[in-house]
């Protein structure tokens, strides 16, 4: 029963914050309590994961692996809330932003708590609806509202694909439990696999299902982009792991479809990123490229490949959230835009922010000593061990191509002269510094000591 405590605490906390906000609509108070609720839930989830707790009743199947993912999502949520409160206040966004983040995390937590398609859909819808709202949280901002509507329209296709896939799944198996797959390779089951995969490919921004991503990421408040581009990805890839574990192996050659979509996404995201003049849109296409890396990792179901992919997803989430949060700090200065020209000589105006953003970009490239390097190396070795040389070679080529557009922004920050002589001062408070430093420490720490996290993932995924 203790395995349910993190979700119970979050649920009660959300209800409390909704009531409290009616009487005390203070960003500082609601933000602090939101941070506390999410952080406590995350710590408890990781504690129970390490203790091997399990709950397997009422269509739920909470084990050590799902508890680990819950813990990571809740802690990452708490970090983003902590780092975003000053941005919320500067942009006069809605106080509801805080518990919208908690609602998304709760939906994702429900989603990874079950191997039943009905429960997964319930969690998916709670998270998705809250994400649509989160994108449109900027007051009196047409672009934000337009981005939210586009995300709603295209994101709703996920529900349609998921529902169709579930219908075919019931027709093929007569139940909704993913773990009870024992059917022949019939057409209905193959279609179920295809539609379920497309549903989550759309959610993780994999090409050619990525069209909502650039507009949603650019139109959302930047701190909200930091959240929706990272925390949900952990939950969605966890479900893709379940599909890769139980459904895809039963369908002949389906792993090749996953791998090919991954290759398309990797090259499309990384190549189109070069054409972007906005740092925010560039990072949006970076997420599309990374979706390709992750899908290629899942395309070969072996312990090293899939555990490396989950490890990579987790550390990528911290690196990407950190990068977007640096952008949100810059955006608090009212005249700031994310055009590349504004990043010229950023190092002279704010050495800390320029250095932090450069380190996050190096982490996204995937070079040592950052934790993302370990994830990429593990995926590559997993592909080699599976004799998937075609995907392994393309994986390396895609990673090399991606380095260029990250380095382009770094060159602008450190080696380009400003476009104007206007030496705009950039504000930076203590909470900004602490928040960004926390993300940097995590990305560095698990790069130097990867086994601490990697061994837990490997053990929980295949023995939890």
From Swiss-Prot:
Cellular component per GO? plasma membrane
> One GO MF term, please?
NADH:ubiquinone reductase (non-electrogenic) activity
Q: Which Pfam families match?
A: Proton_antipo_M
InterPro entries (UniProt xref): NADH-Q_OxRdtase_suN/2, ND/Mrp_TM
Q: Which UniProt keywords are given for this protein, alphabetically ordered?
A: Cell inner membrane, Cell membrane, Membrane, NAD, Quinone, Translocase, Transmembrane, Transmembrane helix, Transport, Ubiquinone
Q: What is its EC number?
A: 7.1.1.-
Which terms under GO biological process does the entry name?
ATP synthesis coupled electron transport
What residue ranges are annotated as transmembrane? 12-32, 33-53, 62-82, 93-113, 117-137, 152-172, 189-209, 227-247, 254-274, 282-304, 310-330, 351-371, 400-420, 434-454
Catalysed reaction equations from the record: a quinone + NADH + 5 H(+)(in) = a quinol + NAD(+) + 4 H(+)(out)
How is the subunit organization of this protein annotated in UniProt? Answer: NDH-1 is composed of 14 different subunits. Subunits NuoA, H, J, K, L, M, N constitute the membrane sector of the complex.
Assigned protein family:
Belongs to the complex I subunit 2 family.
The record's annotation in NCBIfam families points to: NDH_I_N
Return the protein name: NADH-quinone oxidoreductase subunit N 2
Q: Its encoding gene is what?
A: nuoN2
């Amino acid at each position: 029963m203790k395995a349910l405590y993190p979700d119970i605490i979050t649920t009660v906390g959300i209800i409390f914050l909704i009531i409290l906000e009616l009487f005390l609509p203070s960003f500082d108070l609601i933000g602090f309590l939101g941070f506390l609720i999410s952080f406590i839930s995350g710590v408890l989830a990781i504690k129970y994961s390490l203790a091997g707790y399990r709950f397997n009743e009422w269509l739920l199947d909470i084990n050590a692996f799902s508890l680990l993912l819950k813990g990571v999502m809740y802690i990452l949520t708490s970090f983003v809330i902590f780092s975003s409160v000053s941005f919320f206040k500067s942009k006069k966004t809605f106080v509801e932003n805080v518990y919208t983040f908690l609602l998304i995390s709760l939906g994702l937590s429900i989603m990874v708590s079950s191997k039943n398609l009905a429960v997964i859909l319930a969690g998916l819808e709670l998270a998705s609806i809250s994400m649509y709202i989160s994108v449109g949280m900027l007051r009196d901002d047409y672009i934000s509202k337009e981005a939210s509507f586009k995300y709603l329209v295209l994101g709703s296709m996920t529900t349609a694909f998921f529902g169709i896939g579930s219908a075919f799944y019931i027709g093929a198996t007569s139940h909704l439990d993913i773990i009870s797959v024992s059917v022949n390779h019939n057409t209905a089951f193959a279609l179920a696999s295809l539609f379920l995969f497309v549903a989550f490919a759309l959610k993780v921004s994999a090409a050619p299902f990525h069209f909502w991503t650039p507009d949603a990421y650019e139109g959302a408040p930047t701190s909200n982009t930091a959240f929706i581009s990272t925390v949900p990805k952990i939950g969605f890839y966890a479900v893709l792991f379940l599909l890769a574990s139980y459904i895809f192996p039963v369908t002949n050659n389906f792993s090749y479809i996953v791998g090919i979509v991954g290759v398309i996404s990797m090259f499309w995201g990384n190549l189109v990123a070069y054409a972007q003049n906005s740092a925010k849109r560039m990072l949006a296409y970076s997420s599309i490229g990374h979706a390709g890396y992750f899908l290629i990792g899942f395309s070969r179901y072996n312990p090293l490949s899939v555990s490396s992919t989950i490890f990579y997803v987790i550390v990528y989430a911290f690196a990407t959230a950190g990068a977007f949060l640096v952008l949100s700090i810059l955006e608090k200065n009212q005249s700031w835009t994310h055009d590349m020209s504004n990043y010229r000589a950023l190092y002279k105006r704010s050495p800390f922010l320029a250095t932090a953003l450069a380190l996050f970009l190096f982490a996204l490239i995937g070079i040592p000593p950052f934790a993302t390097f370990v994830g990429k190396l593990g995926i590559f070795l997993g592909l080699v061990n599976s004799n998937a040389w075609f995907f392994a070679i393309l994986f390396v080529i895609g990673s090399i191509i991606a380095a260029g557009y990250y380095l382009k922004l770094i060159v602008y920050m450190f080696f380009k002269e400003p476009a104007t002589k206007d030496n705009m001062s950039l504000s930076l408070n203590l909470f900004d510094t602490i928040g960004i430093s926390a993300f940097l420490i995590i990305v560095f720490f698990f790069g130097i000591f990867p086994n601490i996290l990697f061994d837990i993932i490997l053990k929980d995924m295949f023995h939890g």
